[in-house]
Swiss-Prot record:
HAMAP family: Ribosomal_bL19 (MF_00402). This is Large ribosomal subunit protein bL19. Gene3D superfamilies: 2.30.30.790. The gene is rplS. InterPro entries: Ribosomal_bL19 (IPR001857), Ribosomal_bL19_sf (IPR038657), Translation_prot_SH3-like_sf (IPR008991).
């Protein structure tokens, strides 16, 4: 069971939709465990408390990939903010229809 003390200890960085983040999560393959990175644009954050989730979108070899991560999952090894964005919306689902330069978010000052 995860307690509120465990949540504070994890030290989750402050990030918002529009920020480019790198999520390192643990993957179990057979009897081995390794860390895999997923770097992309955070397009949404939802929920509160222990059940918070966030959506990260990236382009991998010409294919757009979205992944939903539980914020306080023990599978997440770390979250790092690469750059800050300054969108005008809380949910950036409109990015799904955009391609190329139009799919970018303005950088924060």
């Amino acid at each position: 069971m995860i307690t509120s003390e465990d949540i504070r200890e994890r030290g989750v960085p402050d990030f918002k939709p529009g920020d480019t983040i790198r999520v390192e999560y643990r993957v179990v393959e057979g009897n081995r465990e390794r860390t895999q990175a997923f770097e992309g644009l955070c397009i949404a954050r939802r929920g509160s408390g222990i059940s918070q989730t966030f959506v990260v979108r990236k382009n991998s070899f010409g294919v757009d990939v979205e992944r939903i991560f539980p914020l306080h999952s023990p599978k997440i090894a770390g979250i790092k903010v690469i750059s800050r964005g300054a969108p005008r919306r809380a949910k950036l689902y409109y990015i799904r229809e955009k391609v190329g330069r139009k799919a970018r978010v303005k950088k924060a000052r």
